[in-house]
Amino acid sequence: MVTPRTNSPDNSYTREHPERFSTAGPAGPLGYAADTQADLLLDLDLQDPSDARNASRGSERAHRPLVRERASTGVLRQGSGGKRTQECICVGICMTLMVVNFFFIIFHVRIDNLSTILVAAFCGIVTADFGSGLVHWAADTWGSVELPILGKNFLRPFREHHIDPTSITRHDFIETNGDNFMVTIPFLARMVWDFLTLSEDDVQKKFTWNCYVFLLALFVAMTNQIHKWSHTYFGLPGWVVWLQECHVILPRRHHRIHHVAPHETYFCITTGWLNWPLEKLRFWSILEAVIEQTTGCKPRADDMKWAQKGT
C-alpha cells in the first residue's frame, strides 16, 4: 500500500503541516465543522492564509461564492440536451462492450498463461494511472481558459475544480463518466471483433495484449468516477472505501495532497500508484523546466486569472 509522504524529508510542506492530512480531529471524525463538502476540502487546503505556499492562492476563498453562483445558474455544466444524449449512448455502449469482452476473456483464459495475463493486466492499470496524470498535469499547468474551444470545454473545468473541489460530487454517473467511456469504445469494439472473427490460435496470440487493453480501458473509463469518490466524504459504499483504504483506487487522503496550492504534484487520479515515484523522480517539475526552457512558456501562468474576471 502506497501512503502519502507526510514524513518524507523532501516534502517539507506536508511534514510541517501533518494536521492537514489527518482524517480525525477534535471537531469530529473528519476534523471539521464545515457545512458543505466544498468548505471541508477548501478548508483543508487553506487553513493557514499566512502560509507562503497558500498566500498566492488565498483568493480561492473569495471566489468560492462565484463558483457556487455559476453552479446554481448552470454555468459549470457546459452540456446540452444533445450532449446528455451522447453521454448516455456512450455509457450504454461502453458498458455492454465491457461485459461482452469480460465473458470472452473468461472463456478463452488458460491457466498456464495466468502469470503473463496478470502482469499484462497490472501494466494496463499502471498505464491508465500514468495517462490520467499526464492529462491532468497538462490541463492544470498549460494553456489558458481563453483558448477557443479547448479553453472552455477542457481546461476550465480543471481550473474550477481547484476552487470548488467537490463540485464533481454534484454530477451524476452519466455526466461524470460519459466522455471517458466514449474514449474507450473503439478499443473495446476492436476486441469484440477479434474474439468473434479470429481463430482460437490467433485469439491466444493476442490474448495477453487484449487483457492489457481491457484493464487499461476499464480504468480509463472509471477514472472520473474514482476521482469523484476521492472527493466524496459521506455516503460512499463500503466496498469503495475498502478499495480506497487498500489503495486499489485513488484514496481520499492521498489525493488531498494535490489539492494543496499551488496544485503542482500528485496528478495521477486513477489509482495514484505512480504519484510517489514520479514525485521522487521530480518527473513533472523536470518536464515543466524542459518545456519552459524550450518554449518560454511558464507553467501555471494562467492560474486564477480567469476567476478574477468574475465571468
Q: Which positions does each model-derived feature cover?
A:
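Membrane-helix interface/capping segments
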Residues: G133-S167
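First transmembrane helix
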Residues: Q86-H108
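Hydrophobic alpha-helical membrane-embedded segments
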Residues: S115-S144, F219-K228
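Membrane-helix exit/interface motif
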Residues: F104-F107, H162-T169, F187-D201
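Cytosolic/stromal cytosol-facing helical appendages immediately following the last transmembrane segment
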Residues: M1-T85, E146-L147, I163-I174, D201-V203, ...
